[in-house]
């Protein structure tokens, strides 16, 4: 995701590999603390202690706490933008592509549950120009889902539907795995949750030939979700 250079986070350290490693370490600690005690009450000192680094080291990689929150949220969106296209690469059938896209979205949310919850709670805490960038990033991700839905309707595999609204129903469903994880975790595995979601949010809108196509889509998580390369 190319978020305007004017909004990039400056680092004193110039080694890209070291910057990536240290920022990952610091962001992981910050995500935990922001989720547990809130963005405003968390201090740089607390983040440093959680990450087992000095406050001085943090300031070599981030200018301030807003930088840390921004990169935390940006990382989630980057992962969506990387994983969804990767999961549907090489797939030609619209129904199969849509199912894989939903799976990919939910799998990323599952892997980054704390950060997903944090995005809902704390995007408003970013300065205004960065809030716009985060919203733009989410919109780009959502368009990938919407495009998959549109391909299904255009191909006659799904009846005419408000593609924009259905897209957001799917997005909200994926996010709910993190936001309401406490309510779902004792009832469903991730695989069961996504399977039920496909039955609720995709299958009812399919035409006869769309249902035939969906019946051929693998149901297991192992078959649907491709391991990172």
Swiss-Prot record:
Domain of life: Bacteria
DNA-binding region: 43-62
This protein's record includes keyword Cytoplasm: no
Gene Ontology terms for molecular function: DNA-binding transcription factor activity; transcription cis-regulatory region binding
Coiled-coil regions listed in the entry: none
Domain (HTH tetR-type) ranges: 20-80
UniProt keyword annotations, A-Z: Activator, DNA-binding, Repressor, Transcription, Transcription regulation
Cited InterPro entries: DNA-bd_HTH_TetR-type_CS, Homeodomain-like_sf, HTH-type_TetR-like_transc_reg, HTH_TetR, KstR2_TetR_C, Tet_transcr_reg_TetR-rel_C_sf
Xref: Gene3D superfamilies: Homeodomain-like, Tetracycline Repressor, domain 2
Regulation: Activity is regulated by the effector molecules 3-hydroxybenzoyl-CoA and benzoyl-CoA, which bind to HbdR, alleviating its repression on the three target promoters and inducing the expression of the hbd genes.
Quaternary structure annotation from Swiss-Prot or TrEMBL: Homodimer in solution.
The protein's role, per its UniProt record: Transcriptional regulator that controls the expression of the hbd cluster, which contains three catabolic operons and is responsible for the anaerobic degradation of 3-hydroxybenzoate. HbdR suppresses the activity of the three catabolic promoters (PhbdN, PhbdE and PhbdH) by binding to a conserved palindromic operator box. In addition, it slightly increases activity of its own promoter (PhbdR). The HbdR-mediated repression of hbd genes may play a crucial biological role in maintaining requisite hydroxybenzoate levels in the cell.
Protein name (Swiss-Prot/TrEMBL): HTH-type transcriptional regulator HbdR
Native source organism of the sequence: Aromatoleum sp. (strain CIB) (Azoarcus sp. (strain CIB))
